[in-house]
């Protein structure tokens, strides 16, 4: 354990608060949830509830390297966020900007091949089977006139 406490720790290219427990701080990284963070901490032999700022420089480096290549830690495939990648055919786990870019590319690919989901994305409609009759409306709302105002309008008009 290092002698000093760090309030900001850089892990896998992301600045994380050092005053949070390891699993909750790691959950601030896009693509890492609490369950994944707990599994990674367990595989590396780190206490999941130890404050992130108390980790030594070597432990932080080990953690960053593990997060960059989560697939190699031996986690079960259902824990990974990109199983059976359609282009590479392998199970992967993406984090940070890699995840955002891949999701954007997937949506563009769906639009390009004009799949049902791609067409829904193109039209700006809901994609996952939600109802659209009443919810998700866009544009201006049409107001409803009330009693007295309605009566005055009928007399005048």
From Swiss-Prot:
Give the family per the record. Answer: Belongs to the universal ribosomal protein uS13 family.
Superkingdom field: Archaea
Spell out the PANTHER family in the cross-references.
Answer: 30S RIBOSOMAL PROTEIN S13/40S RIBOSOMAL PROTEIN S18, SMALL RIBOSOMAL SUBUNIT PROTEIN US13
State the coiled-coil residue ranges: none
- Which SUPFAM superfamilies does the annotation name? S13-like H2TH domain (SSF46946)
The name of this protein is Small ribosomal subunit protein uS13
The job of this chain, per UniProt, is described as: Located at the top of the head of the 30S subunit, it contacts several helices of the 16S rRNA. In the 70S ribosome it contacts the 23S rRNA (bridge B1a) and protein L5 of the 50S subunit (bridge B1b), connecting the 2 subunits; these bridges are implicated in subunit movement.
Q: InterPro entries attached here?
A: Rbsml_uS13_C (IPR027437), Ribosomal_uS13 (IPR001892), Ribosomal_uS13-like_H2TH (IPR010979), Ribosomal_uS13_archaeal (IPR019977), Ribosomal_uS13_CS (IPR018269)
A GO cellular component term found in this entry reads: cytosol
The Swiss-Prot or TrEMBL record annotates one GO molecular function as: rRNA binding
| Keyword terms | Ribonucleoprotein, Ribosomal protein, RNA-binding, rRNA-binding
Gene Ontology BP annotations: translation
Summarize subunit and interaction data from the UniProt record for this chain. Part of the 30S ribosomal subunit. Forms a loose heterodimer with protein S19. Forms two bridges to the 50S subunit in the 70S ribosome.
Gene3D superfamilies annotated for this entry?
1.10.8.50, 30s ribosomal protein s13, domain 2 (4.10.910.10)
Q: Which organism is it from?
A: Thermofilum pendens (strain DSM 2475 / Hrk 5)
